[in-house]
């Protein structure tokens, strides 16, 4: 069974960044929870991005409970851009915003998050997509794009302005992945269980990681990680069998096992010349509590591979600061 010698880092929807010699993990939680580490194994709680909540959160989602969802963080020209979402669970009453800082280190005199507000909003009975799970990628031409979405009629890609805090004009949108089972009712997500896009550039390809099936159901969770690839950031993304992700394709990267009932909502990085897959996994021995996993990622004939055994050996320990 999985190692339980120390309290592990409990996160949902983790993303990472590195500033200097310090790694940071940001996750879904009150105000966006984040942690720091020198070695990617031993972590301490840093704090939260928002001490309260974005000023617009209650207006977008009247039932907002303080939890900001599924962040992504990137660095450009010495500034850090953190994207996040506000949503009502199971509804597309959602919006994504961005907040900017000159550093991730709260001990720095330059540390101050400046929120730029809503970038994209979805409204029930108007939009057949969901404005959650933002993730940013820069294409080979230097243009930045945001992938996002869940359920409904699939995952989207939209071009960003050079300032990274608004959409480019004229707007350019693409559907990059979808699954059968989306409802015709704009307020109903249907059974097309797909979410959490993340695009990772490697060896001339854009790799689109997605999560299939159900998260957040405890021991009933069925989450798993899939992938497709494209030579063009806008797609089409095809799996290893040549099936388009827009048509429900997706090559399995990793799924649950006896020790970990389910796992998903990944990001991917290259640190110090090595590739990593970062995600949360629900531990069977701990009542399906979600734990941070950072697994080495290798490549087989141009496709990402992680070792299932690393789920048990690559633990992440929470330390007292």
Show the residue positions of the predicted features:
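Carbohydrate-active catalytic/glycan-binding domains of CAZyme proteins
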Residues: 1-321
């Amino acid at each position: 069974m999985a190692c339980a010698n120390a309290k592990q880092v409990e996160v949902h929807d983790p993303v990472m960044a590195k500033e200097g010699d310090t790694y940071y993990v940001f996750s879904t939680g009150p105000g966006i929870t984040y942690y720091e580490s020198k070695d990617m194994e031993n972590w301490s709680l840093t704090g939260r991005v928002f001490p309260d909540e974005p000023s617009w959160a209650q207006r977008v989602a009247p039932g907002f409970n303080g939890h900001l969802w599924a962040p992504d963080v990137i660095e450009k020209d010495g500034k850090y851009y953190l994207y996040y979402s506000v949503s009502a669970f199971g509804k597309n009453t959602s919006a994504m915003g961005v907040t900017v800082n000159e550093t991730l280190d709260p001990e720095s005199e330059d540390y101050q998050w400046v929120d730029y507000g809503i970038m994209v909003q979805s409204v029930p009975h108007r939009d057949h997509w969901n404005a959650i799970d933002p993730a940013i990628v820069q294409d080979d031409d230097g243009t930045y794009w945001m992938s996002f979405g869940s359920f409904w009629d699939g995952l989207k890609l939209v071009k960003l302005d050079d300032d990274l805090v608004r959409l480019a004009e004229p707007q350019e949108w693409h559907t990059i992945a979808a699954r059968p089972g989306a409802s015709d009712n704009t307020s109903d997500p249907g059974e097309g269980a797909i979410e959490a896009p993340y695009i990772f550039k490697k060896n001339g390809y854009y790799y689109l990681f997605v999560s299939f099936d159900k998260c957040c159901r405890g021991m009933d969770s069925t989450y798993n990680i899939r992938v497709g690839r494209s030579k063009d950031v806008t797609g089409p993304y095809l799996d290893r069998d040549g099936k388009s992700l827009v048509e429900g394709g997706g090559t399995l990267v990793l799924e649950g096992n006896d020790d970990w009932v389910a796992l998903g909502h990944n990001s991917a990085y290259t640190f110090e010349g090595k590739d990593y897959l970062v995600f949360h996994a629900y531990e069977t021995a701990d009542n399906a509590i979600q734990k941070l996993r950072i697994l080495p990622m290798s490549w087989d004939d141009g496709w990402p591979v992680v070792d299932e055994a690393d789920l048990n050996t690559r633990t992440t320990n929470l330390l007292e600061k």
